[in-house]
Amino acid sequence: MAKRLDLKGVNIYYGSFHAVAEVTLSVLPRSVTAFIGPSGCGKTTVLRTLNRMHEVVPGGRVEGSLLLDDEDIYGPGVDPVGVRRAIGMVFQRPNPFPAMSIRDNVVAGLKLQGVRNRKVLDETAEYSLRGANLWDEVKDRLDRPGGGLSGGQQQRLCIARAIAVQPDVLLMDEPCSALDPISTMAIEELISELKQDYTIVIVTHNMQQAARVSDYTAFFNLEAVGKPGRLIEVDDTEKIFSNPSQKATEDYISGRFG
């Protein structure tokens, strides 16, 4: 668990459109790295590239090197499904299988892998729900539909589903944007706990959230409409928010644009 990601000279295309240019950065294990920047700057595109989710869009391709603990996840013969198992994704809006039970939501990935042993499935469901700080709230209704949970609980259910397959990295695409403040606080506390076991990358438009939950922050920006997004700087979160090295970063986090 908790592996390192290294991007070297990564360029991302959709057909002839150059979406993101020349990204080089390292994401360290057992830490939270926040991707920030204005809409359209490429931060979510880069996030999706980390587990090859961008490939579901026709024409999506990557140039450059993207390593998971020195293994090229775009190397010849590498199975994208295996990559997505090692690098899990939690999306912007909670997306549990609404008619499926809470228990079956959590172990859906294991069942797809062919696991049928009930004891293993039950133990994994409990372990994952505890890991997502949801067990005590749902342990007496595991057979009820996941769609019946509140929005915040559904998002934690999705996190439990992601960690059930024991990934090395967790990607989170604005995981709190659709949640109320209390649910947001619960997710932020959970992120701080999960980083003890996982490498976490989070995309957020909330500067206060980035400052609260992340150890490192990467700022992306767009030169102009039609131009590719670029990584402007990446550093310790405290430095990015107190003394950034680039004026564009300072302007963005101070609210002058974006």
UniProtKB/Swiss-Prot annotation:
ATP binds at G37, P38, S39, G40, C41, G42, K43, T44. Residues 5-247 form the ABC transporter domain. The keyword Lyase does not apply. The keyword Cell membrane applies. CDD domains: ABC_PstB_phosphate_transporter. One of its GO terms (molecular function) is ATPase-coupled phosphate ion transmembrane transporter activity. One of its GO terms (cellular component) is plasma membrane. It is found in: Cell membrane. It is an enzyme of class 7 (translocase). InterPro entries: AAA+_ATPase, ABC_transporter-like_ATP-bd, ABC_transporter-like_CS, P-loop_NTPase, PstB-like. Pfam families: ABC_tran (PF00005). It comes from the Bacteria. Its main location: membrane. It catalyses: phosphate(out) + ATP + H2O = ADP + 2 phosphate(in) + H(+). Keywords: ATP-binding, Cell membrane, Membrane, Nucleotide-binding, Phosphate transport, Translocase, Transport. GO terms for biological process: phosphate ion transmembrane transport. It is a peripheral membrane protein. Its EC number is 7.3.2.1. Belongs to the ABC transporter superfamily. Phosphate importer (TC 3.A.1.7) family. Part of the ABC transporter complex PstSACB involved in phosphate import. Responsible for energy coupling to the transport system. The complex is composed of two ATP-binding proteins (PstB), two transmembrane proteins (PstC and PstA) and a solute-binding protein (PstS). This is Phosphate import ATP-binding protein PstB. It comes from Mycolicibacterium paratuberculosis (strain ATCC BAA-968 / K-10).
